Structures are given as C-alpha cells and as structure tokens.
Amino acid sequence: MRTQLFTALLLGLGLSSIGHADVIGLKADASYWNFDGYSQSANASKQDLDRQGTAQLSVAFEHPVPLLPNAKIKYVNLDSNSEQSTPLNAVDIELNNIDYILYYELLDTIVHADIGAGLTNLDGTVRNLNAGALTQYDLDEYSPLLYATAGVKLPFTGMSAKAEAVYSHGSDIKKTDVQAELQYDFIDNLLVDVGAKVGYRIMNIDAEQNNAPDLELEFKGPYIGLDIHF
C-alpha cells in the first residue's frame, strides 16, 4: 500500500502543471542544532540523551525546466549518548541521516510551497545497555520519503517564516522529521541572498530488528544557522 501511494504521488507530481523557478538557483544551508531527546526499547525504561551540538546541512538545486523536479540533499549527524550512564544502564548512538529529495514548487511568491518525494538513509549503530543486558541495533536502510515545505515572506522587512516536514517509512524504520524557523535576510541583491535564522527541530525514529525489542528514538532542540541563495 505504501508503495502504491508513493508511486501515485510521483506520477501526480510529474503530470501536474506545477510552478518552477524563473532562473537556475543554488541554495545552501548550514546550521548548528543543539539537541537532546531519549532512547527507549520495548519493555525497558526510557533513557534521556545528553544534550549535544551538531551540524545540519542542506543544498538544493532549482531550475526553470518545466516538469523536471528540483533536487535537494539534507544531512545531519545524530551521535549521542545517555545523560546518566551507569555500569548497568547506558545508551551510545552513532547515526547519520541523509535525505535525497526531488521536489516541485507549488507556489513561489511571497507565499511559497514545495512538495516532493525521495529516499532517506539512516546509517549507524545504537547500543542500549538496560539492566546489564546489551542490545545492539545496526541500522542501514534506504526508505521512501514524502517531503513538504511552506513559508511566507514579509515584504520590505527581510523577514520570513518556514516550516518543513519529512516522513519516511521503510521495511524496518519509520521516521518523522519536522522543523520550523524564522529568517532575516541581511544581504539581498541580484547576485546572492544571505539570511540568518533560528528554528526548532524534532525527529522521531522507530526501528525494528530481528531478535531485538523495538527501538524508539527522539531528537529535539533549537538551532541557529545561515542560508545562502545564489
């Protein structure tokens, strides 16, 4: 069923008369995400994660060719560990997330909206020590994703607001990733736009593995960063 919905969305996107960029453009984003969260396996107590700082990066390419989708890649490192570790209870997370997205612009005025689809890759290891019993989860899966973003610009102020969501569901991993931000463009000309932004991001991951309890992870926290548009 998920495969049928995913295919239908791709066909709908490709056949619709959807807006596109007026010129070729390149967008890049670099942010510092200060997150905490928790790790919990079935039938075990929740273990809070120590607050960490990490880089979250994205790059997008847009063009004026009708029906051909734009492309975007998002990356974040999710390495973390438990806030309070003991010889019997601890969590160690070594995890990377990359989203490969093809999307279309539905609107591109003072109000903008994009919708797309693609693949997400979660790759790494989660080690849960609970009551002295160690369970290791080895994650490496490409899952289909759905992508949407919407935002609004306040004319003549340089201010804008945006919300973005990614949802993926594969055979063993489900992920929900939502973020919202405010941005101020302090450089705005024909060559380049540069903005400073502040936002909040929440990512939830549910994973299954043979002969292991189901795993639930949450990462959440504020971020600050720069956005550049050529």
Describe each region flagged by the PLM.
Residues 20-81:
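Short glycine/proline- and aromatic-enriched beta-strand/turn motifs that initiate or cap beta-hairpins
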Residues 22-24, 51-55, 94-98, 111, ...:
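Residues that define the transmembrane beta-barrel architecture of outer-membrane proteins
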Residues 24-28, 57, 69-73, 111-117, ...:
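Transmembrane beta-strands of outer-membrane beta-barrel proteins
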Residues 25, 32, 218-230:
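Outer-membrane beta-barrel "beta-signal"
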Residues 30-36, 63, 75-81, 119-125, ...:
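Transmembrane beta-strands of outer-membrane beta-barrel pores
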Residues 38-45, 82-89, 125-134, 172-178, ...:
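Outer-membrane beta-barrel translocator domains and adjoining extracellular loop/strand segments
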Residues 57-63, 100-104, 117-119, 146-152, ...:
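Residues on the lipid-exposed face of transmembrane beta-strands in outer-membrane beta-barrel proteins
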Residues 65-159, 188:
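Gram-negative (and chloroplast) outer-membrane scaffold detector with strong preference
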